[in-house]
A protein has these predicted regions:
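Outer-membrane beta-barrel proteins
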Residues: 202-219, 273-280, 396-398, 548-555
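Amphipathic, charged-and-aliphatic alpha-helical interface segments
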Residues: 48-98, 117-122, 203
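Outer membrane beta-barrel
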Residues: 214-307, 412, 417-432, 575-589
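Exposed, low-structure sequence patches enriched in small/polar residues
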Residues: 176-180, 284, 302, 338-669
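Transmembrane beta-strand segments of Gram-negative outer membrane beta-barrel proteins
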Residues: 134-171, 189, 193-199, 235, ...
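N-terminal, intrinsically disordered low-complexity tails/presequences enriched in Lys/Ser/Pro
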Residues: 21-62, 127-141
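Bacterial Sec-dependent N-terminal signal peptides
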Residues: 1-26, 669
Length: 669
């Protein structure tokens, strides 16, 4: 006992010394981790926003490291299965952790991984037995949070200008139905991550507020989620998401990128989850329940979800509208004009690293889409985890079309890890809920992704090569096509205060060329170099250089450069945080655009796309007012040097610059 106490005190002291030397504020550290988790270039803007919200929620409601299950820890993509097993083995052998400093005693957690993990877990007490539900205790001990946000543009788009009645009668879509303000409000309740309920509401810029409906906001998302109550393992009512297998049949609503697929495709979070964000697509509205007994879990769900669509002749769905905008008469006419009925069941068995599941799905659209009035299918999946290797696969059949996904991971003693992912999707395979990894969409594709990772004390290296083929014609390629994708990254820790990070990506894929009348290879390259320095006064300086190149035989070569400088500092004992980012960009065309991460407000998407020639500056101030209150302000502006106006149609701004302000208020009680 005395030896354990000594080791615990030593570990806690070591962690404290490391924190003192790093001198980085919690807010700055969190922004750095969030940027790392969202750095996969293949992620769409919707996927980044959804993942950002998920990680923010996990950060605000951390897990108790002493009671967290493998499934809960597997939601963190930077943790390997071996590291999760080592954490559980340490707790089993030595008892509950008294502090997070003991993480360094588990054997396989390096300093950077421990630093990231600290933002999502805490070392808490282990109850002798699971707490019984008592309404008074739930309401007393639960955590409430209210988040309000407003975005205020300091410019005027053409859609908000005055249009005469005669003009609107002839061109009704030239004017937006609402004002230019965008705002949202969210309330959430959380009791030990076992009972969660809340509601989110959102209005995008240009959408009407109390003009077209009596509810005010354009989108509402109510939800109730209950976990581990008797035989009920999970219960979701309202808006929720579901993930079974590895995303071929029923996924979480967004596509994962290749880097994320290599690290986490074999441990995607399974089951039901509440949809608490303001994303207006990719969720189900109804109810789902999972019953668990022993190693077996049975899940069933039913939903009726209104969706937006572009119709052909009011009788056939031409395409689904996923942006959630309802600003003009035309966009408003597409609001909830279609519906989707969904029934699904899943049975999965888990025991000592082995998991096997079977899923059945039946769906019915209110209008036919591509000749389908509905979909019926099933999938079967399995995974096997061992300390040195992992295997996973899913086989799905939907209306007679087949999709297959298989992955393997091998971990070697010298710090090297080898991953591979094979996928084969039929040309006509189509699931409305897939989030499986793909070069394009989850259909008409066969590919093999192979990756290699090496971790050492001060250097992390990783890379992959993806060889893919589209056996049938697709958009942009009128016949069978193929391609290759290469990516490499390295992260060097240069002493206690400096870090150097570099990425390089090369992609070559075939597409139609009007110049030669046949398929030609389009070659793109994207490179990034980042230097981070932690100053002695607690500030952080971050300098980044980006370069992009686009080369296609029928078009001039397009180059793009961006240089950014960021400064972060905390004042008044972390009561005030300031982040400033300045960028200068020079790109020839949109094809050589560059995506840059900015520090921003909580629960928000903080990547911006820069193209053209100009400068960008943004500043974020967060003030902790005490008693769970936080007020944040972000101001940003961009100035173009190569144009006199920005965008076109209703989005046109009659100026070469635009500025905006965002305000956020958070109350926790």
């Amino acid at each position: 006992m005395h030896f354990r106490l000594f080791i615990t005190m030593f570990a806690a002291l070591s962690g404290t010394v490391a924190t003192v030397f790093s001198q980085t504020s919690d807010e700055t550290e969190w922004e750095n981790v969030l940027e790392t988790l969202l750095s996969d270039e293949d992620l769409s803007s919707d996927a980044r926003e959804e993942l950002s919200f998920m990680y923010e929620s996990m950060h605000e409601s951390p897990l108790n490291i002493n009671t967290a299950t493998r499934e809960e820890l597997s939601q963190l993509p930077f943790l390997t299965f071996k590291q999760i097993e080592d954490i559980h083995a340490y707790i089993y052998m030595h008892g509950p952790m008294l502090s997070l400093g003991e993480l360094q005693l588990t054997g396989n957690l390096d300093y950077e991984t421990r630093k990231m993990l600290r933002l999502f877990v805490y070392a808490g007490d282990v109850p002798v037995k699971r707490q019984k539900l008592r309404l008074a205790e739930v309401l007393r001990d639960g955590h409430n949070e209210i988040v309000g946000r407003m975005d205020i543009p300091l410019y005027l788009r053409d859609g908000y200008r005055y249009h005469s009645p005669e003009e609107l009668e002839r061109y009704p879509n030239r004017a937006y139905l609402g004002n230019r303000l965008s705002h949202s409000i969210r309330y959430s309740f959380n009791w030990h991550n076992r009972i969660r309920f809340g509601i989110s509401a959102d209005k995008d810029a240009g959408e009407p507020f109390f003009k077209r409906n009596c509810t005010g906001y354009d989108f509402w998302s109510p939800y109730l989620y209950v976990k581990d109550i008797g035989l009920i393992k999970e219960l979701a009512i309202g808006n929720f998401k579901v993930q079974f297998g590895y995303g071929l049949l029923l996924g979480g609503g967004f596509s994962i990128g290749k880097s994320m697929a290599l690290s986490s495709i074999d441990r995607n979070n399974q089951g039901l989850k509440p949809h608490s964000s303001t994303q207006e697509y990719g969720y189900l509205r109804g109810a789902g329940v999972a019953f668990g007994r022993g190693h077996t879990t049975f899940t069933m769900l039913a939903s009726y979800t209104p969706i937006d669509a572009t119709l052909k002749g009011d009788t056939v769905i031409g395409s689904f509208k996923e942006d959630g905008f309802h600003r003009t008469e035309l966009e408003w006419s597409k609001k909830n004009n279609t519906s989707l009925r969904t029934i699904a069941t899943n049975v999965r068995y888990s025991y000592r690293g082995l998991r096997y599941g079977v899923t059945f799905l039946a769906e019915k659209l209110s209008l036919p889409y591509k000749g389908h009035g509905g979909f019926m299918g099933f999938s079967t999946d399995f995974s096997l985890h061992r300390p040195r290797y992992a295997l996973a696969a899913e086989f799905s059949v939907l209306d007679g079309n087949v999709a297959v996904l298989a992955s393997q991971t091998f971990r070697f003693q010298n710090g090297w890890t080898m991953n591979s992912v094979f996928r084969s999707y039929s040309p006509d395979y189509m699931s409305l809920h897939t989030n499986a990894m793909a070069e394009g969409s989850v259909q008409n594709e066969t590919g093999l992704l192979m990756g290699l990772t090496h971790d050492s004390r001060n250097l992390k290296m990783s890379g992959y090569i993806d060889l893919f083929m589209h056996p049938e014609p697709k958009y942009g390629a009128s016949e069978r096509s193929n391609g290759m994708d290469l990516r490499a990254e390295a992260d060097w820790k240069l002493g206690r205060r400096d870090n150097l990070y570099a990425t390089a990506r090369f992609k070559s894929k075939q597409k139609d060329c009007s110049y030669t009348g046949q398929l030609e290879y389009c070659i793109t390259g994207r490179y990034r170099l980042r230097w981070t320095h932690n100053c002695r006064n607690g500030a952080e300086l971050k300098t980044q250089l980006y370069y992009a190149r686009y080369d296609f035989i029928a078009e001039p070569i397009s180059n793009g450069w961006t240089l950014t400088q960021s400064y972060s500092k905390s004042f008044l004992n972390d009561c005030l945080d300031i982040d400033v980012t300045a960028a200068a960009f020079y790109t020839d065309t949109y094809d050589s655009r560059i995506s840059v991460y900015e520090s921003g407000l909580r629960y928000s998407y903080n990547f911006i796309s820069l193209y053209g020639k100009g400068t960008r500056i943004a500043a974020t101030i967060r003030c902790n007012l005490g008693r769970g209150l936080q007020l944040s302000l972000k101001a940003g502006g961009i100035c173009y040097l190569d144009r006199d106006e920005i965008s076109s149609a209703q989005q046109r701004i009659a100026s070469n610059h635009k500025e905006d302000i965002s305000v956020q208020f958070i109350s926790k009680f």
